[in-house]
Amino acid sequence: MIKHFRHAIEETLPWLSSIGADPTGGMTRLLYSPEWLETQQQFKKRMAESGLETRFDDVGNLYGRLCGTQFPEQVILSGSHIDTVVNGGNLDGQFGALAAWLALDWLKATYGAPLRAVEVVSMAEEEGSRFPYVFWGSKNIFGLANPEEVRHIQDAKGTGFVDAMQACGFTLPAAPLAARTDIRAFVELHIEQGCVLESNGQSIGVVNAIVGQRRYTVTLNGESNHAGTTPMGYRRDTVHAFSRICSQSIEKAKQHGDPLVLTFGKVEPQPNTVNVVPGKTTFTIDCRHTDAAVLREFTEQLENDMRAICDEMDISIDIDLWMDEAPVPMNAELVAALTRLCETEQLNYRIMHSGAGHDAQIFAPRVPTCMIFVPSINGISHNPAERTNINDLAEGVKTLALMLHQLAWQK
């Protein structure tokens, strides 16, 4: 079984990865780009050739369906997103969609038609890399995406969302799509994008929850002034204020310990020149934890600490909390079933949380959902160096196939 999946991956992953490949060795496949469209069309063709019924929905989510014999109205769904970050790797997202197809193809050849329908989904978008909107694919599956929220947004080059969509043959719906009600379960295979599995010599992660996230944009306003003639005690230096906030907050996060993580990812001082005291600094904060109460308590204290530092330094502060996503638990029964499967197959696995967001977090509050992780070499992702050992990839597809067999071929 592992040998079969290893061969299948070696044959199909380079093919799928060639569409949108960067000269640097990475991949760029943004929503409604020519590369995105070619990928979805080619994947649709390959799934159809393998005997699946294929279709696009109104926004470009791609499905490949194997009909069920006894419960055709019940769907077991598996897959992931097909888009990438700019100059990303070739496993994040697309391997989950590819793996679902490879698993289903093997199951069909081995066991014939399932009792319940099984669908592979290659979701249109998850990353938010081209337009300022995330989970466009999975949100539309459940009627959660409001077309008015994207109607007037543009990418960095000034191309409108609607125009890009139309260029690929799709039309923005006038209203949210009808939510699917036929999905009995969703299983997503994904690379870990971290170093836990590899560091512990384990090949499979059974995900029990996806962390909650709070993201901020913070703006500090002080006073720009001459770098040579303004004494240190008279400055309203926003970079100095930022450095204090950053250092103090990170130390508190370290003291708090896992699974809390805190990142200051983007810093923009103004006027950003060598001989002027920076009078304005804008920065972002990303904080994550598996417990909603802990996440809220830590970030509220962080907000108070920032205000206290700015008050002391005579600097005004504007705090914009623009993302507040609660932690999302996976379905307990599916997690237990997946755990039993790993035990039966004597897999080297661990139960763990996901520190990154995934399409599964959109599914989980609405349908029974579980996730399978495979290791990321050196924990690297969103990078051309994103890699996973071929045997671990094959182990992941095998685990997915066995899970789908339980859900769709057994009563």
Which residue ranges define each predicted feature?
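His/Asp/Glu-rich mid-to-C-terminal helical/loop segments that flank catalytic regions of hydrolases
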Residues: 38, 210, 226, 230-256, ...
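Zn-dependent metallopeptidase/amidohydrolase metal-coordination segment
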Residues: 9, 15, 22, 79-80, ...
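A short beta-alpha structural unit
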Residues: 29-32, 263-272, 284-290, 316-335
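N-terminal capping segment at the start of a domain
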Residues: 2-33, 124, 382
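Midchain, well-structured core segments that form catalytic/ion-binding scaffolds
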Residues: 125-126, 130-292
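A non-catalytic alpha/beta surface segment that caps or lines the substrate-entry region
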Residues: 21-67
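Alpha-helical metal-binding/catalytic segments enriched in His/Glu/Asp
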Residues: 78, 88-127, 214-220, 226-252, ...
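Active-site metal-coordination/substrate-binding segment of hydrolases
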Residues: 44-48, 53, 62-164, 395
